[in-house]
Amino acid sequence: KCHHEQNINKMGGLRFSMPITFVTFTVAGLSLIGVPGMSGFFSKDLIIDIFKYNNNYIIYYMLVVSIVVTTLYTTKIFFKVFFGTNKLKVQKSNDLEHNKTLLIPLIVLAIPSAIIGWALFDTLVFNHFFSDSITDGNTLSYFYQNYIINSVNFFLHSFTSLSFLALLIGLLLSYFHYHKKNKISNNILVKIPMIKNILLNEYGFNQLSNSLIPNN
């Protein structure tokens, strides 16, 4: 209900009172940050590899850094909304997840978020799907046809990639800072105020949108 509390800092513990929302958000979140095996992982790593194997290293490293950022803001919502103390004192009831108009789309969209990458991998890679893009897709196709071969090998190969390391860094930082309230992560923010200011200002996106889009 949009007219109720929207500040995630005032939420917590909602995984028990909104279990379906919790499960579908978890699936969608894992896909968004590109956890190996999820649909978002296939699309993310394919895009990253396009730049890597075409020697566009500046964009490649920018994308790797963006994985950490994406992981941080996604898991921040996850920990603050669904874990910790139930600050809203919300009890499990049919009133919270009673509307099929909302629940059915959540469930329907969560399913392909988990599995569609496996189904489309061969089509995207081995049928030269990227050959007409702005980069040389044939280089990528050659690499996958000769070294990766199939989606299972691509999945296993991902655990040795730099993007997976970036994912782990983002997960660990988020877990200790947002969930465990670790003193080390808090000290890092205190000693490096620039990082704290960037996070508090939400990367400047709100200021940018407010300056470009009229309030009325």
Task: Identify the function of each model-found stretch.
Residues 30-33, 71, 81, 85, ...:
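Phosphate/oxyanion-binding loops and surfaces in catalytic or ligand/nucleic-acid-binding neighborhoods
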Residues 3, 9-16, 46, 83-84, ...:
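Short amphipathic alpha-helical coupling elements at transmembrane boundaries
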